[in-house]
A protein has these predicted regions:
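A glycine-rich, aromatic-flanked flexible loop/lid motif
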Residues: 28-43, 58, 80-91
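Catalytic-core signal marking the mid-to-C-terminal active-site face
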Residues: 71, 76-164
Length: 164
């Protein structure tokens, strides 16, 4: 399963990074002067986020937005933020069962080989680790199941204020 924003970082990840007082690991968008930045607060001022994969990512992003919007008759990404809250956005889920094409054992072996190849890649930083897409989130889920879900205090206070 691949679940990802078609921008370099999702809006949620940009907000989370800002709330944690951190910078993005690589540029994720533009500031108000048109400069690439890793500062999530400056990106939130413009919401000019980088697409994944630059020009190829732009093509994929446009194609997926067209498919999702046409199939759901919901709002295109161009409408994000125009209604205040993010409502009525188009979403499409595509599920493919690889076991309809191969045995479970073969599928698992192929996946394990590919993940091992990814994990064997040279990390960007000496002593760093290479993660496959979704691995960090999987690790976070396992930690949360074991230890509970940490909530940023500012977000928790907002949730509590909704009770009143």
């Amino acid at each position: 399963m691949v679940d990802c924003a078609v921008s370099q970082f999702s809006y949620g990840k940009i907000e989370e990074t800002r709330l944690k007082g951190r910078q993005l690991p690589v540029p994720g968008g533009y500031d108000s002067e048109g400069n690439l930045t890793t500062d999530p607060a400056k990106i939130e001022e413009t919401w000019r986020v980088l697409p994944m994969g630059y020009w190829k990512g732009s093509g994929i992003s446009i194609a997926l937005d067209l498919i999702a919007t046409v199939l759901t008759n919901a709002n295109s990404v161009s409408k994000i933020g125009t209604f205040g809250d993010e409502v009525g956005l188009s979403q499409v889920m595509i599920a493919i069962d690889p076991c309809k094409f191969n045995s479970v054992e073969l599928t698992d072996r192929i996946v394990d080989e590919i993940l091992a190849d990814i994990k064997a890649s040279q990390p960007a930083e000496t002593g760093g680790e290479v993660f496959y897409p979704g691995e960090i989130e999987l690790n976070t889920r396992q930690e949360n199941l074991a230890n509970g879900i940490p909530v940023i205090d500012e977000v928790w206070q907002t949730i509590l204020s909704l009770e009143r």
